[in-house]
UniProtKB/Swiss-Prot annotation:
<dbReference type="InterPro" id="IPR036188">
    <property type="entry name" value="FAD/NAD-bd_sf"/>
</dbReference>
<dbReference type="InterPro" id="IPR004417">
    <property type="entry name" value="TrmFO"/>
</dbReference>
<keyword id="KW-0285">Flavoprotein</keyword>
<keyword id="KW-0963">Cytoplasm</keyword>
<dbReference type="GO" id="GO:0050660">
    <property type="term" value="F:flavin adenine dinucleotide binding"/>
</dbReference>
<keyword id="KW-0274">FAD</keyword>
<dbReference type="GO" id="GO:0047151">
    <property type="term" value="F:tRNA (uracil(54)-C5)-methyltransferase activity, 5,10-methylenetetrahydrofolate-dependent"/>
</dbReference>
<dbReference type="InterPro" id="IPR002218">
    <property type="entry name" value="MnmG-rel"/>
</dbReference>
<feature type="binding site">
    <location>
        <begin position="9"/>
        <end position="14"/>
    </location>
    <ligand>
        <name>FAD</name>
    </ligand>
</feature>
<keyword id="KW-0521">NADP</keyword>
<dbReference type="Pfam" id="PF01134">
    <property type="entry name" value="GIDA"/>
</dbReference>
<comment type="function">
    <text>Catalyzes the folate-dependent formation of 5-methyl-uridine at position 54 (M-5-U54) in all tRNAs.</text>
</comment>
<dbReference type="InterPro" id="IPR040131">
    <property type="entry name" value="MnmG_N"/>
</dbReference>
<keyword id="KW-0819">tRNA processing</keyword>
<comment type="similarity">
    <text>Belongs to the MnmG family. TrmFO subfamily.</text>
</comment>
<dbReference type="GO" id="GO:0002098">
    <property type="term" value="P:tRNA wobble uridine modification"/>
</dbReference>
<dbReference type="GO" id="GO:0005829">
    <property type="term" value="C:cytosol"/>
</dbReference>
Length: 450
């Protein structure tokens, strides 16, 4: 008798995982605590409820990484994309949906599937046996959070998410910036040049502080707390404590020499640190912020060297429950210490509806394949889905791991293409062409049981 797959959480990831597994011929029990146990953000007990925006972002599958993710999920027969297409609204090049019709359709479709049973009620522990996928999202209940923390170690589960902006390396002006660790610390050349530095003189620093203090800020949402951990103070809060605070904190200029102007000591320095193994993404160190997105881009582009910066992710601080996935999950999305349990969706450290659904798609297929005795590896990191799972299962730096949207900085480079802004269109088209080919190969590579 074929084993039943249990999936906890009926959001984007859990709904997609249930659909994919059931379509592969596996019986699924989908556990959803709503409406019996609610959250401060959800309004209904529907599956696939969109609690924030109603946008799935860009639908451009040639020049945009999230649009490519749309394409991959459609090619895999994804439920979330099918329902989004069915209920899409006019939104230019973006994919926006009627959130109520979308969630109702997801619920109705899953309820009608002969292999899916939906059980309403809270799951508050990690079962010792059976195949399970936990896709409980950033609003995981306190009881289940405690159970996950007990299994993974308390430090592995974050409850307050401090996010610094991430910049594409090829958009940084290296005629103004340079690579150097403070005091040239490190045993290897790579360690001694681990940070990217952007210098400021006194006038530039004062103008930056003025812009920071004047920028529009996002207010905390209902259910969030305004108490900060000292280790993740927003930069604007630090600036409010004194105009020199940042210059003696994350922007201190000590231990650094600007090779472009070796005789001029910077008044302040903004440091960026590599955020992925490919070296295509750099995060701005200590720059977690509650500034609104438009204000962030304007303020951060006043930093010398970042005038033309392109951002893979803007900063923010909000409550978020997520695993330190690079240390805890394998490429099959299994908990290394409990391989009968997989995680999917935002709790794995991806950010966004589409990314969450994509991780649900992958977890559902991988779990179903294991149950059916089918050999199925994770997709190549040249695909959007594969790039995400590679990032969260080890490609990201575990010590600085934070939730991530899909972006081309996660993809391995295509050889022989021009770098920089001028070559971007051809480069992105090469990424998406390669991804589509490799994704189709992955979809066709499922082997029958021996």
């Amino acid at each position: 008798m074929t084993q039943t797959l249990h999936i906890v959480g009926g959001g984007m990831a859990g709904s997609e995982a249930a659909w994919q597994a059931a379509e592969m011929g596996v019986d699924v029990v989908l556990h959803e605590m709503r409406p019996k146990v609610g959250t401060f953000a959800h309004q209904t007990g529907l599956l696939g409820e969109m609690v924030c925006s109603n946008s799935f972002r860009s639908d451009d599958d040639e020049q945009n990484a999230v649009g490519l993710l749309h394409w991959e999920m459609r090619a895999a027969g994804g439920l979330i994309m099918r329902m989004a297409d069915k209920h899409r609204l006019p939104a230019g090049g973006a994919l926006a949906v009627d959130r109520d019709l979308f969630a109702q359709s997801v619920t109705d479709t899953l309820t009608a599937h002969p292999r899916i049973t939906i059980e309403y009620g809270e799951i508050s522990e990690l079962p010792a046996s059976g195949q399970w996928i936990f896709a409980t999202g950033p609003l995981t209940s306190s009881k289940l959070s405690d159970a996950i923390a007990a299994q993974t170690g308390g430090a592995a589960l974050a409850f307050f998410d401090a996010i610094a902006p991430i910049v594409y390396f090829d958009s940084i002006d290296m005629s103004r910036a340079w690579m150097q660790s403070r005091y040239d610390k490190g045993e290897t050349e790579e360690e001694r040049t681990a940070y990217l530095n952007c210098p400021m003189d006194k006038d530039q620093y004062e103008a930056f502080i003025d812009a920071l203090l004047a920028a529009d800020k996002t207010e905390f949402k209902e259910g969030e707390t305004a108490d900060y951990f000292d280790g993740c103070l927003p930069i604007e809060v630090m600036a409010e404590r004194g105009r020199e605070t940042l210059r003696f904190g994350p922007m201190k200029p000590v231990g650094l020499t600007n090779p472009h102007q070796p005789d001029v000591k910077p008044y302040a320095v903004v440091q960026l640190r590599r955020d992925n193994k490919l070296g295509t993404l750099y995060n701005i160190v200590g720059f977690q912020t509650k500034m609104k997105y438009g204000a962030q881009a304007a303020v951060f582009k006043t930093i010398p060297g970042l005038e033309n910066a392109s951002f893979a992710r803007l900063g923010g601080i909000h409550r978020n429950t997520f695993l330190n996935a690079p240390t805890l999950l394998d490429e099959q999305m299994r908990l290394r210490s409990r391989p009968n349990i997989r995680f999917a969706g935002q709790i794995t450290g991806v950010e966004g509806y589409v990314e969450s659904a994509a991780m649900g798609l992958l977890a559902g297929r991988l779990a179903a394949a294991e149950i059916l005795g089918i050999s199925l590896s994770a997709p190549a990191d040249t695909t959007a889905t594969g790039a995400l799972i590679t990032h969260i299962s080890g490609g990201a730096e575990a010590k600085t791991f934070q939730p991530m949207n899909v972006n081309f900085g996660l993809f391995p480079p295509v050889e022989g293409l021009k770098g920089g802004r001028r070559g971007r269109k051809d480069r992105y088209k090469a990424y998406t062409d390669r991804a589509k080919r490799d994704w189709q190969n992955w979809l066709e590579a499922v082997k029958e049981p021996a």
